[in-house]
């Protein structure tokens, strides 16, 4: 029985954590302890570190032919910083303004004004030790080229013109509202702390996020755009019907 107990400790509770949120009482803690035991999670396993290195292809554009496609999927992106980088929290504000919510620059121009797509987004995807800045959309085959040019146009605007305080305030209010929703219920609160634990972030991550959203300036947004939104290194991947 001792051997079975040792196997259980090593394989079933190693590298695990229990998160309790809401109205947590001593009785609840006692019941959880009785159910899982006092040694739950104490036998940490040394998991191998996973790495996902990116190797950029030399081509600026990759086209994947889909002869019968009515629309084309367009992806644009390149490698960028991770969440632990000092610039990341303010870069989040830039990416939200650029393509991270319904009123973003990309949505306002390419969807609302030009009508090239029903939706377009920009954000940062994360992998161990690396980040991927990605712009994603779908459009009619005939609009692929003008759509891509409008993406570059919006990047140029961010390089050349400081955003207005009015626009920055709208983005701030949106992001602060999203942050509030992350803590409004016991389930969302526990999800927030699970995110911290599994992403290897410090406990002050959310307070630093709040500070960054409130303090970032138009000049900083412009500087970040010039350093992290680079047309020359942006790769284009298109899957659809090639027009002659």
Label each region the model flagged:
Residues 1, 103-104:
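Short linear Ser/Thr-Pro motifs
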Residues 2-46, 81-82, 99, 112-244:
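Charge-rich, well-structured scaffold segments of protease-associated domains
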Residues 44-103:
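His/Glu-based metal-binding/catalytic segments typifying zinc-dependent metallopeptidases
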Residues 107-108:
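Phosphate-proximal small/polar/acidic motifs at interfaces that engage nucleotide phosphates
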């Amino acid at each position: 029985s001792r051997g079975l107990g040792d196997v259980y400790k090593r394989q079933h509770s190693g590298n695990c954590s229990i998160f309790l949120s809401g109205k947590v009482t001593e009785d609840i803690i006692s019941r959880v302890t009785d159910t899982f035991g006092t040694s739950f999670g104490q036998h940490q396993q040394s998991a191998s570190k996973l790495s996902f290195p990116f190797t950029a292809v030399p081509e600026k554009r990759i086209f994947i032919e889909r002869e019968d496609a009515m629309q084309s999927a367009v992806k644009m992106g390149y490698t960028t910083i991770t969440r632990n980088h000092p610039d990341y929290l303010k870069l989040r504000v830039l990416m939200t303004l650029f393509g991270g919510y319904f009123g973003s620059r990309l949505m306002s121009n390419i969807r609302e004004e030009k009508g090239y797509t029903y939706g377009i987004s920009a954000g940062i995807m994360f992998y161990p030790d690396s980040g991927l800045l990605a712009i994603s959309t779908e459009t009619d085959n005939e609009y692929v080229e003008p759509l891509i040019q409008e993406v570059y146009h919006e990047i140029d605007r961010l390089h050349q013109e400081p955003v207005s305080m009015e626009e920055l305030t709208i983005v701030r209010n949106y992001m602060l509202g999203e942050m509030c929703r992350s803590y409004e219920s016991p389930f969302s609160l526990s999800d927030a702390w699970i995110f911290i634990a599994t992403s290897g972030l410090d406990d002050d991550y959310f307070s630093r996020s709040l500070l960054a959203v409130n303090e970032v300036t138009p000049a900083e947004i412009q500087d970040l755009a010039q350093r992290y939104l680079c047309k020359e290194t942006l790769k284009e991947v298109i899957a659809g019907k090639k027009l002659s």
